[in-house]
Design a protein with these regions (language model features):
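Short catalytic-site patches enriched in acidic/histidine residues
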Residues: 7-44, 50
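Catalytic core of Fe(II)/2-oxoglutarate
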Residues: 22, 38-134, 142-144
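Short, small-residue-biased leader/transition segments that mark boundaries at the very start
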Residues: 1-6
Length: 146
């Protein structure tokens, strides 16, 4: 079952504990293989350098799409490709962001052996449905009573 989410832009989702910045979308990595993203000229997307932990604005380019690597790809490559840690700054102005989430089927096993990686596996091997269910728990939209 697929779900759609529209975020309320009238108030921040949270304030970053790292630097006190108001966020329209909390700091996270995407769950899937990759995300292809169109963002309008309002921007707001930031990516984090995994070594310095500094944040960098992703500039708007009308002729380009943004590609974020996801956590499932990190698992499949046994960490050789890292998921992109990112966030969206809070802005009350209307902002258009259109993501396409490239994800495997729910029964796909996230196993590095699919890519001929057999040694020193660093991640738990599971099917994508269980992996996704656990990954989505970090988002406020999914934090509601059963």
């Amino acid at each position: 079952q697929r779900q759609m989410c529209i975020r309320d832009r009238d108030k921040p989702v949270e304030v970053s504990s790292q630097d006190g910045v108001a966020l329209g979308c909390e700091t996270h990595v995407d769950s899937g293989i990759m995300t292809i993203l169109y963002q309008d000229k309002k921007g707001g997307l930031q990516v984090q350098n995994r070594h310095s932990l500094d944040w960098y604005d992703v500039p708007h380019d009308p002729n380009a799409l943004v590609i974020n690597t996801g956590l499932a790809l990190e698992y499949l490559t046994n960490g050789q490709m890292k998921a992109t840690n990112h966030r969206v700054l809070f802005n009350q102005e209307e902002r258009i962001s259109i993501p396409f989430f490239f994800e495997p089927s729910y029964d796909f096993i996230l196993d590095p052996k699919h890519l001929d990686i057999y040694e020193n596996i660093n991640y738990n091997i599971d099917n994508y449905e269980n992996f996704l269910t656990n990954s989505l728990k970090k988002f406020v939209e999914y934090d509601r009573p059963a």
